[in-house]
Amino acid sequence: RQVPARAAGPDVWSGKVTDPQVQAKAALLVDRKTGAVIYALNEHDELYPASLTKIMTCLLVLEAIDEGRLKLSQEVTATPTALEGLAEDGSTAGIEAGEILTVEELLYCLMVVSANEAGAILAEKISGSVDSFVDRMNARAEELGCENTHFMNPHGYHDSLHYTSAWDLYLITKAALEHPMFMTVCDAASHTVPATNMSEERTLNNTNFLIRSGREYYNPDVHGVKTGSHSQAGNCLVTTAQHASMDLLCVILGADRTQDEKGIWWTYSFVYTDKLYNWAFDNFSYQVILKEDDAAGEAPVSLSSTDHVTLRPAQAVELLLPKGADLEELEKTVVLKSDPVEAPITEGDVLGSMTVSLDGEELAEVDLLAFTSVEASRIRVLWRDVKEFFSTTAAKAALGVVLVLAAVLGGWKLLFSRRRYRYGRSVGGGGRRGAYRG
């Protein structure tokens, strides 16, 4: 297994690449291939996510489908209770009470046009009530390892107790991306909802301008995932981007929307996302640190005529590093499971691990395997077993008992022999005196 470790972007790459100068409340750029963090800004701060909340809502719907509790083709009727309390000026697909849509169409309404009512309708369908669904949202967040997240609703309406972090959103989105339907829905630039019992067909245009050709922010490398905004949250965005062999995920929270001197409004969640992707594509590349058949050190061996075994990585170690990075600067630390390693050893046995670091920050960890098998020496194993036996408390106690018994038996034997000697002298002397009569 290769276990990539988190690496704080700006700190690690300082002096090696230029700072992209992101002025949002939080930002995170992660390499999906290795899990390494390329850029991080306040990634654990608790912030309002607005409609990024719907990523979790969508995840729970897709999981319910996988579990057989729901079907994409299943029809759902919008109830008055689901629509209750939704603001008229919020993002909507215009779904009305009594209207019937399939789960699939509700997902498109939820993720493409960010319809708040779609989130509430799906929540009620899955859990029986919106409140019960929110409980499941929080439980699922905890299961995913989110430590700075608490939801109060399935759509992202502002509440002081409704918050998350850039890192937690990464964890939630990562889980959602395991479902192919998630990207199918959220990467749609537009979608046409067929006519329903209460509406003619309607066309939904994605709120993410980075994936809509013809928009000023359009970037063909960017795909999905979700926008979010309200006055307290600012402008928020989660996306992925693929370029050459790179596959990245970006989270922006709390970006501004400002008007320039020409009167043009700029939404900086789009601007910073595009900036971070281009910065990463221009400045980073994958570099092979260790090949699978490379020697990665040696481990001392005991109980064998061979005194060491060569180690190799369990798999190739490939890291996303600044272009032109000096690989000699990487620190490789080997930790063995035992030192020395006892024979017999089978080729492929996990004997330890290697951590790869840069400037004290861990970039990756990989298991180290035995390159070859090593046979044990029977004589050395026997001698080891003998020494171990006599070093145990039980063996020492047994030896002590044996010595005590030997001493007791020896004492009895000596005492018995002395008594026999005295008895013999007494009997012999009396006989002689009786025979002499003068």
Task: List the predicted regions and their residue ranges.
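Domain-terminus/edge residues, biased toward the C-terminal soluble/receptor-binding domains
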Residues: 146-150, 158-163, 167-405, 409-425, ...
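Intrinsically disordered, low-complexity repeat and linker tracts
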Residues: 1-8, 297, 323
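Short, charged, intrinsically disordered terminal tails
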Residues: 8-21, 419-425, 430, 434-435
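Active-site-adjacent loops and short helices of periplasmic peptidoglycan-processing enzymes
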Residues: 3-167, 171-180
